[in-house]
Amino acid sequence: KYFKYNLIFKRPSGTSRGVLTEKETWFIVLEENGRKGIGECGILRGLSADDRLDYEEKLQWTCDNIHLGEEKLWQELIEFPSIQFGVEMAFLSLKSENPFVLFPSKFTSGEKSIPINGLVWMGDEVFMKQQIEEKIAQGFNCIKLKIGAIDFDKELQLLRFIRDNFDENKIEIRVDANGAFSENE
């Protein structure tokens, strides 16, 4: 079986293809011998490769045919990578000692962190600058900016702001321009 759960963003988040306010998520639930396995199938509308009209129909088909097993389902779901992920996760969850901890580690036990980038969502120049300052104040040493929503020169100014105000040996800059520019640009 599966059920849907919409994750509502705390703040609208700009991408090169529009503003996101929620993330549609479906959870596949497997049950066997009194144990449960849970797998997440999530898409971002307008961004995910499997954002299709027949998505939920394929999810129902998957649940109806779960007896085919993980390997066969993987082949049948090649056009639905998020459902493949959910199936793989559900089977791993079913086999795990704790269905919510698939790969026990110092990270999952809270003993160790994983350094990641501080993501700066698209928005106007003031909002993006505010996020940059917040991420650096929070200790991020890699700042990733989603670009393509505002004037390119203003985005360049934001990059210059980081370089002019923060040590380039301590702050790494990454940009995410997915879908923001055409091949000619």
Walk through the language-model features, giving the residues of each.
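N-terminal capping/lid subdomain adjacent to the active-site entrance of alpha/beta enzymes
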Residues: 1-173, 178-180
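Catalytic cores of alpha/beta
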Residues: 182-185
